[in-house]
């Protein structure tokens, strides 16, 4: 498949083990191909009746799935992981067409996705409670039980991967899931739904409802939904938390960030430069945990900046389906204009643009309406600038200088966010000392933006709470029941 040729011809909701058109509507949306600006799908947003049917089907499937042993669930999840590996190219291509990221990156996302399913398949068979001995031969035990119907609400930057990160632990624990993707990227999650069905999950265990805010509200407020897991912006996360609170539903929130990347003078310069590029320009900079505040110790500021600019200017921009492309278009035109607006404000506030920050128009005629820009490096930045304080969510790196360790830690923590942070240094004592002081949920030492599924991922402060990935996530998709067993006679105070 080549850029500019794809068009959606099938329904985009998934319920009861098949693609379906929603039975009612709460509006319509259009999905675009960012590389060309073409509309590739016009679809109906799910209304209350459709949401009710999705929940109803999920409840029925939950009764079957939750009664299976952990090993039975394990085998089905392993089969789903195998099918994802088998269909890797198809999934990655769909992701690239709808999201705009390079096919090179999309393939990595698919690999992380099947690894996530394999990891939680392994944990499904090991879920267990505890036995506690009590006086007189009595005892107690705990059971770790599923929650019921869970809702996953995804973001548009990693559509397929996020759906796997949310559904794999949910299903491993015995839950059902209804997933609502971003209306910007409605396509690839349908492939995951089909894969789960092919692997052998009961019909209705993993349903997809399309829509925007109204559909999301219907899901969050539904009386039969047991949990919400959301990835997206802080304002939307706050609304979801408020809606869920009225129903006393637990939530996992993976929200925004303005993460610090600290480069000490004793770093390995080559690795630090590569780390800074990884921290700012993956998926066109549209990554919540990006280290966009790059603090560089003054002794190496000039050398580091020179090398970062040189490497940034070498990034190949263009058709995301071409093998040598490393940066594709941004998600849509309003977002592109928003990012360019941030660069404009940065210049007005005194920042200096060393490279990029402007529109990029590819030579290929079919790409001329795409949403491209050159990756941007800013210097002369101050902590009070808009580009340093607010999440930009685009390919814009802000470089700031610092003198001492104590100073940079204080400045790094001066933010309402707390998703991620990174440190580059050869001094291992300093590295551990600094990350212990950083107020962030995901910290990297001498690397950045790697995401092994074995490690928990999530934030501090306004970046959210709860975790995705790692063993601990099992606790967020299950509940603990305590059973007390009396082996003697009841001792009564009456």
Curated annotation (Swiss-Prot):
Active site (record annotation): 254, 288
Modified residues (N-acetylserine): 2
Main localization, broad class: cytoplasm
GO terms assigned for molecular function: 4-trimethylammoniobutyraldehyde dehydrogenase activity; acetaldehyde dehydrogenase (NAD+) activity; aldehyde dehydrogenase (NAD+) activity; aminobutyraldehyde dehydrogenase (NAD+) activity; formaldehyde dehydrogenase (NAD+) activity
Biological processes, Gene Ontology terms: aldehyde metabolic process; carnitine biosynthetic process; protein homotetramerization
Compartments it resides in: Cytoplasm, Cytosol; Cytoplasm
Keyword entries, A-Z: Acetylation, Cytoplasm, NAD, Oxidoreductase
Positions in coiled-coil regions: none
Residues with PTM N6-succinyllysine: 30, 59, 303
EC number: 1.2.1.47, 1.2.1.3, 1.2.1.46, 1.2.1.19
Reaction it catalyzes: 4-(trimethylamino)butanal + NAD(+) + H2O = 4-(trimethylamino)butanoate + NADH + 2 H(+); an aldehyde + NAD(+) + H2O = a carboxylate + NADH + 2 H(+); 4-aminobutanal + NAD(+) + H2O = 4-aminobutanoate + NADH + 2 H(+); formaldehyde + NAD(+) + H2O = formate + NADH + 2 H(+)
Pathway(s) served: Amine and polyamine biosynthesis; carnitine biosynthesis
InterPro entries per UniProt: Ald_DH/histidinol_DH, Ald_DH_C, Ald_DH_CS_CYS, Ald_DH_CS_GLU, Ald_DH_N, Aldehyde_DH_dom
Record has NAD as a keyword: yes
An example Gene Ontology CC term for this record: cytosol
Annotated NAD(+) binding sites: 180, 232-236, 391
Protein's UniProt keywords contain Glycoprotein: no
N6-acetyllysine: residues bearing it: 30, 298, 303, 344
Role noted for this protein: Converts gamma-trimethylaminobutyraldehyde into gamma-butyrobetaine with high efficiency (in vitro). Can catalyze the irreversible oxidation of a broad range of aldehydes to the corresponding acids in an NAD-dependent reaction, but with low efficiency. Catalyzes the oxidation of aldehydes arising from biogenic amines and polyamines.
Sequence similarity: Belongs to the aldehyde dehydrogenase family.
PANTHER family, A to Z: ALDEHYDE DEHYDROGENASE-RELATED
Oligomer and partners: Homotetramer.
UniProt protein name: 4-trimethylaminobutyraldehyde dehydrogenase
Taxonomic source organism: Sus scrofa (Pig)
Gene symbol of the encoding locus: ALDH9A1
């Amino acid at each position: 498949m080549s850029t500019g040729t794809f068009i959606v011809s099938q329904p985009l909701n998934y319920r009861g083990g098949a693609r379906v058109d929603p039975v009612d509507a709460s509006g319509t949306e259009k999905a675009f191909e960012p590389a060309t600006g073409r509309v590739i799908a016009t679809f109906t947003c799910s209304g209350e009746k459709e949401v009710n049917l999705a929940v109803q089907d999920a409840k029925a499937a939950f009764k079957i799935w939750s009664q299976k042993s952990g090993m039975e669930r394990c085998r089905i999840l392993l089969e789903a992981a195998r099918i994802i590996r088998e269909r890797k190219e198809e999934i990655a291509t769909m992701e690239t067409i709808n999201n705009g990221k390079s096919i090179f990156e999309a393939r990595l996302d698919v690999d992380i996705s099947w690894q996530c399913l394999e990891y939680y398949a392994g944990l499904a068979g090991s879920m267990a409670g505890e036995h506690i001995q009590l006086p007189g031969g009595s005892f107690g035990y705990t059971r770790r039980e599923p929650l019921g119907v869970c809702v996953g609400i995804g973001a548009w930057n990693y559509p397929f991967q996020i759906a796997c990160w949310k559904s794999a632990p949910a299903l491993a624990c015995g839950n059902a899931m209804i997933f609502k993707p971003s209306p910007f990227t409605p396509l690839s999650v349908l492939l995951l739904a089909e894969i789960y069905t092919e692997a052998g999950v009961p019909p209705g265990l993993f349903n997809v409802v399309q829509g925007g805010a109204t559909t999301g509200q219907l899901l969050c407020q539904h009386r039969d939904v047991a949990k919400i897991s959301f990835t997206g912006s802080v304002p939307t996360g706050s609304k979801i938390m408020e809606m869920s609170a009225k129903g006393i539903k637990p939530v996992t929130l993976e929200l925004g960030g303005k993460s610090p990347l600290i480069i000490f003078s004793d770093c390995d310069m080559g690795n630090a430069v590569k780390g800074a590029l990884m921290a700012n320009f993956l998926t066109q900079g549209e990554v919540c945990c990006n280290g966009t505040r790059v603090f560089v110790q003054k002794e190496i500021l000039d050398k580091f900046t020179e090398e970062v600019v040189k490497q940034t200017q070498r990034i190949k921009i263009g058709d995301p389906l071409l093998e040598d492309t490393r940066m594709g278009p941004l998600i849509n035109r309003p977002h592109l204009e928003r990012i360019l607006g941030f660069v404009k404000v940065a210049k007005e506030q005194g920042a200096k643009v060393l490279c990029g920050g402007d529109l990029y128009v590819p030579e290929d005629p079919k790409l001329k309406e795409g949403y491209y820009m050159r990756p941007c490096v800013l210097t002369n930045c101050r902590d009070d600038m808009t580009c340093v304080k607010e999440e930009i969510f685009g390919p814009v790196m802000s470089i700031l200088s610092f003198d001492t360790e104590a100073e940079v830690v204080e400045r790094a923590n001066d933010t309402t966010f707390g998703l991620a942070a990174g440190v580059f240094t050869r001094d291992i004592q300093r590295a551990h000392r600094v990350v212990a002081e950083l107020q962030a949920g995901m910290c990297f030492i001498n690397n950045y933006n790697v995401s092994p599924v074995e490690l928990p991922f999530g934030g501090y402060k306004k970046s959210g709470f709860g975790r995705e990935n790692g063993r601990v996530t099992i606790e967020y998709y299950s509940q603990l029941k305590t059973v007390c067993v009396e082996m003697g006679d009841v001792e009564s105070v009456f």
